Swiss-Prot record:
The modification N-acetylthreonine is found at residue 2. It comes from Dictyostelium discoideum (Social amoeba). InterPro entries: AB_hydrolase_fold, Hydrolase_4, MAG_DAG_Lipase. This is Uncharacterized abhydrolase domain-containing protein DDB_G0269086. The keyword Nucleus does not apply.
Length: 937
């Protein structure tokens, strides 16, 4: 079953190639696979086609900078970005079936970190093979320091990842395919190498936080990533977690590409299926993966101004006043024409004031723009100074880092030179020690050969002595026998015949025994010859192995040989003492027994005749046979014991020496292999140091060129900044001059304004004087009219209404004046200072009305109309004559009302609040009429 390829776009606009193996039936699980460093997802076709056949869907992607995905080859900016890429791929998995994370080598490191960090996307299981927790070969401190330094300066700069293709698998076909694969590379960036080593070693410390079902697979012969680190991580994962550790024998790094790959794939599939069944049993209806999306809602609140709304009722309330005065406007056209010149004057002032305000606003706007510009220029200048300062600090840091790198490289060079000198000294000392050991070895071998020869000669002498003693014993026995024969010659013929027979048998037995002993001696000599040959062969092998042994092994050998020699010497002395004691005891016993027997036989011969001699002869023969049998058995047993002990001791010594020689040879071999590995590592380090030195020189050259270019750039920018500074200073001087002129102009306007305010104050004083005169005249006129009215009322009560109608008609000019004053109201709104002066007059009216608080409360009920009347009287001031008369009459009426003592009038004003307004209007009309008559007079 083949795979399909598609593309996904990451958050930083990189393209990831996604390879998918889809089963023909509904998937029972999904797997997100993360490949290792330098390879790509296409190398797992034979593994995941088996997964798809078993109903498991697999999504494998080429990491950024790998395979056919985009990005710098061998570069990923950070662990977090790599985990985001994994999350992007994992989000494509089905959510209704169990989801597993599978990572190999460096991908295994990412898979473990993903399960530790992405708690909201908890998978059903995690499978990691040969994970990168620690490298199999420890990275040197020089490499780490150089990598950390250069990784911070040039994170995307790529170097070789030092992976040996021959160590990925023991299958040569896999190695050849790996070498010929064009999508495989051996690159890694300095920045990625830095964070990869740092974050991988953190996994052992983070292992107690791991809570996902785990299958950890590693090969014991892995030479790329460390199997012991996997064991440590596994041991630190809590025991409550479902975890499995599988260590494969006789395999290299890629366990899925070894000869037993089918067995490996079957093992993985069985583990996954078991976890699927567990997931079904635990929560058959729950989804394994859940994605949570957060939505943020932003609410914008708009607040409207209440000022406009509050002003609407005022406008509406003033409408009826205008409508009521419409008929009057038509009748009072001459009055309107007379008051036209006044609004023109007011319009010009309003226009001037408006222009002045516009100029002030424009000047304020220009000043604001100038200040904003100055602030922006100041901020830009500070930013530029900060940038120059930062660049200078960066340059200084770069130079400092380069100096530190140079110092580190120099220190590393000195350390390597010292190590080389130490190595030469060590080799010299080892050569001297080897020569001394060889000489000592030859001396000890000579001594051992001499001791062995002496021991051999001693044993041969002892054997010859034993044979000689046995021979002498037999000869003595033979002499005794002859003596007995002489004594027995006197015996009977039958006894003689029996005796001869017995002697013949004894001679035959002795001959047989002699031949047996000679045969055994021959066999012993042959055995010694074979043992000597074996010893010589062992000695030759021993010399060959010992030639490769180390000084330490030689010292151990010397100690063991000394102990063996001491033990052999002690054993030898013990055996010699025991043999001598046994021989002496046996000799004394035989002599004693022979003497006793001879004495007994002699006594028996003397005492007895022939029977005694026969009995003695029989007893002597029996004794002889017994003694011969005992002596033969004792000699044979002693001989066998000595031979067995000697053979066992020789065999034990031989095995001991062979074991020691083999151990020493193995130790020497391991030492030589270690020295060879150290030599290769040293050569590798020297080559890397040379490359690092070359890279350093290149970087220094580039840094110098960049520094020079940056310096020239900074000088050019400084010159530009100087020009900009001069330009800004010129603009600032021009702006300061303009500001100075503006301030002088404002000062002139302020003085003009103060002059106008002084004139307005004088006009106000004049107005108050005129108002006082008008009030006095109005009061006099009012008293006169009241007197006339009282007289008329007393004369004829029936004609009261006609004057009222006439008075109503007289009021029409007043309404006409109200209409004329509408444009003045608009002028009043513009001339805000005048309104303030009008408001100041209100306390004067209140002081006038202190005696009648009821009337003051009555006036509060209609504040809008009252304010309108105040504005009308205020804006008129001393302009239209009829308006001034109206205000003077109104104030006169108020003063008259305050001083009036008539109870009826006071009661009417208190109970009917609106009538005072009508009366005021009537009084105004009367005042105007009287004033008009006075004017005509």
């Amino acid at each position: 079953m083949t795979s399909s390829v598609s593309n996904l776009l990451t958050s930083d606009k990189e393209t990831l190639s996604l390879r998918t193996w889809t089963p023909k039936v509904k998937p029972i699980a999904t797997v997100t696979m993360i490949h290792g460093l330098g390879e790509h997802s296409g190398r797992y076709e034979h593994v995941f086609s088996r997964f798809a056949e078993q109903g498991i869907k697999v999504n494998a992607f080429d990491q950024r900078g790998h395979g056919i995905s985009s990005g710098v080859r061998g570069h990923s900016p950070s662990l977090e970005q790599s985990l985001k890429d994994i999350q992007l791929i994992a989000s494509t998995a089905e959510t209704d079936v169990p989801h597993f994370i599978y990572g190999h080598s460096f991908g295994g490191c990412l898979a473990l970190h993903y399960n530790l960090k992405k708690k909201d996307h908890h998978p059903a299981g995690c499978i990691v093979t040969s994970p990168l927790i620690k490298p199999a070969i420890k990275v040197s401190g020089v490499k780490l320091s150089m990598g950390n330094l250069l990784g911070g300066l040039m994170p995307s700069w790529t170097i070789s990842n030092s992976i040996d293709p021959t160590l990925i698998s023991k299958d040569s076909a896999v190695v050849n395919e790996y070498k010929q694969d064009k999508l495989v590379h051996n690159k890694i960036s300095l920045g990625m190498a830095k964070w990869m080593l740092q974050r991988s070693e953190q996994l052992i410390d983070l292992a107690p936080q791991f809570d996902t079902p785990l299958l950890l697979v590693h090969a014991n012969d892995d030479k790329i990533t460390c199997p012991k680190a996997s064991q440590q991580f596994y041991d630190r994962v809590p025991s409550t977690v479902d975890k499995t550790l599988k260590l494969w024998e006789n395999m290299y790094h890629e366990v899925h590409n070894e000869f037993a790959k089918e067995e490996f794939v079957t093992y993985i599939l069985e583990w996954i299926k078991e976890r699927i069944e567990n997931a079904k049993n635990e929560s058959p209806s729950s989804n394994i993966n859940t994605t949570t999306t957060s939505t943020t809602t932003t609410t914008t609140t708009t607040t409207s101004s209440p000022v406009v709304e509050e002003s609407k009722p005022v406008v509406e309330e003033s409408k009826p006043v205008v409508e009521e005065s419409k008929p009057v406007v038509e009748e009072s056209k001459p009055v309107v024409e007379e008051s036209k010149p006044e609004p023109v004057v007011d319009d010009s002032k309003e226009k001037e004031e408006k222009e002045r305000l516009e100029k002030e606003e424009a000047a304020a706007k220009l000043e604001k723009e100038r200040l904003e510009k100055e602030e922006a220029e100041r901020v830009a200048k500070e930013a530029e100074e900060k940038r120059i300062k930062d660049e200078k600090e960066a340059q200084e840091n770069l130079e400092k880092q380069q100096q530190e790198a140079a110092a580190a490289a120099q220190a590393e060079k000195e350390r390597l030179e010292k190590e080389e000198a130490d190595k030469l000294e060590k080799e010299r000392l080892e050569a001297e020690a080897a020569a001394a050991a060889q000489a000592e070895k030859e001396r000890l071998e000579a001594e051992a050969a001499a001791a062995a020869q002496a021991e051999k000669e001693r044993l041969e002498a002892e054997a010859a002595a034993a044979v000689q003693a046995e021979k002498e014993r037999l000869e003595k026995e033979e002499a005794d026998r002859l003596e007995k024969e002489k004594l027995e010659a006197e015996a009977a013929a039958a006894t003689q015949a029996e005796k001869e027979r017995l002697e013949a048998e004894a001679a035959a037995a002795a001959q047989a025994e002699k031949e047996r002993l000679e045969k055994e001696e021959t066999e012993r000599l042959e055995k010694e010859k074979l043992e000597a040959e074996a010893a010589a062969a062992a000695q030759a092998e021993k010399e060959k192995l010992e030639a490769e042994a180390a000084a330490a092994a030689q010292a151990e050998k010397e100690r063991l040989e000394a102990e063996a020699a001491a033990a052999a010497q002690a054993e030898k002395e013990r055996l010699e003492a025991e043999a001598a004691a046994a021989a002496q005891a046996e000799k004394e016993r035989l002599e004693a027994e022979a003497a006793a027997a001879a004495q007994a036989e002699k006594e028996e011969a003397e005492r007895l005749e022939k029977e005694k001699l026969e009995a003695e002869a029989a007893a002597a023969q029996a004794e002889k046979e017994r003694l011969e049998a005992e002596a033969a058995a004792a000699a044979q047993a002693e001989k066998e014991r000595l031979e067995a002990e000697a053979a066992a001791a020789a065999q034990a010594e031989k095995e001991k020496l062979e074991a020691e020689a083999e151990a020493a040879a193995q130790a020497e071999k391991e030492r030589l292999e270690k020295e060879e590995a150290e030599r290769l590592e040293k050569e590798k380090l020297e080559a890397e140091a040379a490359a690092a030195q070359a890279e350093k020189e290149r970087l220094e050259a580039e840094a110098a060129a960049a520094a020079q270019a940056e310096k020239e750039k900074l000088e050019a920018e400084a010159a530009a900044a100087q020009a900009e500074k001069e330009r800004l200073e010129a603009e600032a001087a021009a702006a300061a001059q303009a500001e100075k002129e503006r301030l002088e102009k404002e000062e002139t306007e302020r003085l003009e304004k103060e002059r106008l305010e002084a004139e307005a104050a004088a006009a106000q004083a004049e107005k108050e004087r005129l108002e006082a005169e008008a009030a006095a005249a109005a009061q006099a006129e009012k008293e006169r009219l009241e007197a006339e009215a009282a007289a008329e009322k007393a004369a004829e009560e029936t004609k009261v209404e006609e004057p009222v109608q006439e008075e109503t008609k007289v009021e029409e000019p007043v309404q006409e004046e109200i209409k004329v004053e509408e444009p003045v109201q608009e002028e009043t709104k513009v001339e805000e200072p005048v309104q303030e002066e009008t408001k100041v007059e209100e306390p004067v009216q209140e002081e006038t009305k202190v005696e009648e608080p009821v009337q003051e409360e009555t006036k509060v009920e209609e504040p809008v109309q009252e304010e309108t009347k105040v504005e009308e009287s205020t804006t008129e001031q001393a302009k239209p004559t009829e308006t001034e008369n109206k205000e003077e009459t109104e104030e006169g009426e108020e003063v008259d009302e305050a001083s009036n003592t008539t109870t009826e009038q006071t009661t009417t004003n208190a109970n009917q609040p609106k009538k005072p307004n009508n009366n005021n209007n009537n009084n105004k009309g009367k005042g105007k009429k009287g004033k008009g008559k006075g004017g005509r007079k």
